[in-house]
Amino acid sequence: MTELGPTDSAKELIERIARALVDHPDQVRVTAVQGENTSVIELTVAKEDMGKVIGKQGRIAIAIRTLLNNVSMKARKRFVLEIIE
């Protein structure tokens, strides 16, 4: 079993969390745009699932970003989460 790189680990984490939250897990897509020191993790979900991923007053999105920040500290690479409709 090969070890995942930091960006792949971050993508997998976001995908698992999003699939657990939404009603249409088959429509969850996670892609990464890598830069030298920063990677943008793009999360795409079904339109009707946007509220479940964002949460009231953005609380779920903030919690997901907090977890992603913890991964970035360990990896010494900055990750930014973008939630795309």
Where are the regions that the model predicts?
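RNA-contacting regions in translation and RNA-metabolism proteins
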Residues: 1-50, 63, 67-85
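Glycine-centered tight-turn and secondary-structure capping sites
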Residues: 54-58
